[in-house]
């Protein structure tokens, strides 16, 4: 029999940089005193922003929520290629960065718009024979990966301060922004890695409505529980 104190729904959390998505799961479990907690779409430790936490019966719609489009804002750094494709990795190559005309930068971004295939990075949670690729990468191993069919619905170059470029991208499920940045760097001929990333939207949900990790840690349980969106509320928001 279920207790009246059990919580079902989705909690919007604004993940801080430097922590894993699993760290947020553990903090949420403690804050709500419940074991049944999942998350919708891993954010790398470097990244901040919206993480949908599924609570109780909310875990049953986790796959549905994960399938929705995402919006990110980020900063790429031209001239350095890293093994993880972001600033947390080891630098593999350093190249000079020309004074690119804006038209050339626009064209590089435009090449990765609409439908295309993307090769997942070795430093990722994708599994090969049950082993996450990032564990194989730590052992210095590289394995064949299947390219993924992805879609960019919208992109915007927000500012150019070479070697850095700030951008916004709206993309499909399974999209790696790190790889997007890496591929743009290859297109420009000088390499690039992801310096900063923030997820701002996931489906109909916006980070402006999220609880911070500090608020989550501070509690109390009742205050955190009050921020959980009920399953009927989720259906209404999604237009289901």
Where are the regions that the model predicts?
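Catalytic/RNA-binding core of pseudouridine synthases
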Residues: 1-240
């Amino acid at each position: 029999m279920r207790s009246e104190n059990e919580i079902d729904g989705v909690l919007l959390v604004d993940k801080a940089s430097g922590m894993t998505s699993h760290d947020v799961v553990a903090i949420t479990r403690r804050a709500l005193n419940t074991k049944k907690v999942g998350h919708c779409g891993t954010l790398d430790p470097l990244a901040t922003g919206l993480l949908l936490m599924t609570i109780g019966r909310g875990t049953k719609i986790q796959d549905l929520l994960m399938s929705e489009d995402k919006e990110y804002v980020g900063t790429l750094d031209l001239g350095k290629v890293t093994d993880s494709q972001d600033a947390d990795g080891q630098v593999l190559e350093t190249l000079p960065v020309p004074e690119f005309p804006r038209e050339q930068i626009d064209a590089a971004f435009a090449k990765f718009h609409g439908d295309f295939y993307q090769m997942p990075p070795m430093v990722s949670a994708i599994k090969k024979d049950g082993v996450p690729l990032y564990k194989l990468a730590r052992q210095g191993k590289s394995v064949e990966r299947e390219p993924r069919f992805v879609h960019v619905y919208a992109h915007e170059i927000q500012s150019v301060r070479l070697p850095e470029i700030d951008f916004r991208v709206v993309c499909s499920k399974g999209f790696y922004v790190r790889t997007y940045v890496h591929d743009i760097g290859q297109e420009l001929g000088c390499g690039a890695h992801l310096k900063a990333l923030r997820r701002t939207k996931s489906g109909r949900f916006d980070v402006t409505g999220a609880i911070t990790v500090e608020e989550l840690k501070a509690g109390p349980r009742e205050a955190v529980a009050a921020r959980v969106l009920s399953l009927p509320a989720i259906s209404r928001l999604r237009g289901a």
